[in-house]
Regions:
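Short beta-strand to alpha-helix junction loop
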Residues: 5-15
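Short secondary-structure junctions
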Residues: 26-37
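Conserved C-terminal structural/oligomerization subdomain of aldehyde/semialdehyde dehydrogenase
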Residues: 3, 19, 24, 39-180
Length: 180
């Protein structure tokens, strides 16, 4: 896959620090992208994808938002436990489910409490005209400023209610109009 650099050296060091911490906390690092070197971009802030397995709920790599290419597998025994695990988390940016069962996908989308839901896609990053952002402590500010919510924020709403009675020459009435 293709991924650009992180924004700053501090961001890169923070993400690498989370990977180090995950190893220290006992999660199994399956894919380690910390030492990636790109020819011609040696001074860039690059880190390859990292994948942890056997992550536990008390680990910081589970409890905190990393904002880097780090995925964690937290094992559960059934669908309801998976829903509960995600819904109980204090953050709610995005989550994904992979399934061949449409009923499971719809149930997941309806019951999950996060801002962005992916079904059979990795991280759900919507296209430009959709709002971007999470729920709970993952939302920065009080509005999603990208997409329709941003347009609504910067737009003055005007509501017009009208009635077009038949006949221009009718006498004025002082009654609430009703449908006939």
């Amino acid at each position: 896959s293709e991924m650009g650099p992180l924004v700053t050296k501090e961001h890169l060091e923070r993400v690498k620090g989370y990977v180090d911490l995950g190893v220290k906390e006992g999660a199994k690092l399956i894919v380690d992208g910390r030492d990636i070197k790109l020819q011609g971009y040696e001074n860039g802030y690059y880190i390859g994808g990292c994948l942890f397995d056997h992550v536990k709920k008390d680990m910081r790599i589970y409890k905190e938002e990393i904002f880097g290419p780090v995925l964690s597998v937290v094992r559960v025994t059934n669908f309801d436990e998976a829903l509960q695990l995600i819904n109980d988390h204090e953050f709610g940016n995005g989550t994904s489910i992979y399934t061949r069962d449409g009923d499971v996908g719809r149930t997941f989308a309806n019951k999950i409490k996060v801002g962005m839901v992916g079904i059979n896609i990795p991280i759900p990053v919507p296209v430009a005209f959709h709002s971007f952002g999470g729920w709970k402590r993952s939302l920065f500010g009080d509005l999603h400023m990208h997409g329709p919510e941003g347009v609504k924020f910067y737009t003055k709403l005007k509501t017009i209610t009208s009635r077009w009675p038949s006949g221009i020459g009718s006498d004025p009435e002082f009654v609430m109009p009703t449908m006939k």
